[in-house]
A protein has these predicted regions:
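A short, Lys/Arg-rich alpha-helix, primarily the initiator
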Residues: 1-25
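Short, charged recognition helix plus adjacent turn
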Residues: 3-8, 68, 75-88
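Flexible coil/turn residues that form the inter-helical turn or adjacent wing/linker of helix-turn-helix
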Residues: 14, 25, 41, 56-59
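Helix-turn-helix DNA-binding elements, focusing on the entry/boundary residues of the two helices
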Residues: 18, 29, 45, 60-63
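Residues in the recognition helix of alpha-helical DNA-binding motifs
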Residues: 21, 35, 51, 80
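Short alpha-helical DNA-recognition segment
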Residues: 26-50
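Hydrophobic micro-packing sites on short alpha-helices
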Residues: 32, 62-70, 77-78
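Short, basic-rich loop-to-helix N-cap that marks the start of a DNA-contacting helix
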Residues: 53-65
Length: 88
């Protein structure tokens, strides 16, 4: 199996954090997908599901747009990952 571009078999580390923040806001994948369209960022529900399950990479502009829609700071999504690496 090719693990190029993966970390511990995952294509991203931010997906579960996105899911957690989305659920905290009581937002469905469908609502998130629809709200992203207002920012000209097209991430279908199936792709959001794959992101949240570490099965799809996430582009920098997608992370920023997701943070805007969730009304959180980008650092709220990134800090848990930074802290994980600090502990290594």
């Amino acid at each position: 199996m090719n693990n190029f571009g993966k970390y511990n078999g995952n294509l991203n580390l931010i997906g579960p954090i996105i899911r957690e923040k989305r659920k905290e806001k009581g937002m469905s994948l469908e609502t998130l997908s629809n709200q992203l369209l207002f920012l000209d960022v097209n991430i279908p529900i199936t792709s959001l599901h794959r992101i949240e399950n570490n099965q799809r990479t996430v582009r920098d502009y997608e992370i920023c747009a997701i943070a805007v829609v969730l009304k959180i700071d980008v650092q709220d999504l990134l800090n848990p990952i930074v802290e994980k690496f600090k502990k290594l």
